[in-house]
């Protein structure tokens, strides 16, 4: 029996009963309307034109409008945004010859691109959020921001005050100075860490995929779509097979399932949904059947700091 067959068999077992999943899925999604603190993560591929790797202002405008509307409805909103390194790299490429980019993979080049791109990205967000009468703020962090007690305390207080001021914090990893030891490495996990730290009710991962499949649908046309995961187990984690991310991003399905583990064990629902149309954020929060939902499954023994230390 193949790994995919094993997975399908498990899906119809005690924890994933196919006959009851559709009704249970839709009934549970209705509760998303009542979630009060929402973290939204957007990946690089969702912010850029695929043909040019330059910012897609139309999609960013819709994203900001969706988040602003959530804020106006009384929700706490935190945005975790990738894209800085990709934006900075494109700026450098427009000012340097191809020969100068031979060492583009060097960590120092990536960090320089992140520094340039983060400023450009925040300037763009600031302009769009201002158009919708919203205050945005930048938070740059890494794994050590949560692992070290004082840093974690300060980070939590900063987030809390910004939310009290009706701000929308915009979070990214501090890639321009992050060291390998304390680098999270992808914003899927970073967004789950933020959701856990801030006791969020819902984490939405905007991606270039529709959700979770039994296999990579780009390679296997027989891969089956999974819309509802009431419990994240080892068989599900194995299905990711360390899939790769997009050309401009770093997160594949493996990182998304790691994020789901952090979020759900922290008592937070998580949805993976395609960002092809940014208005999907509204559909998810309204409880409609978009993307794959991972149901909150609080684990009283789960400690975020302990988990991060075990993965460092």
Q: Which residues does each PLM region occupy?
A:
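C-terminal catalytic "cap/lid" subdomain
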Residues: 2-312
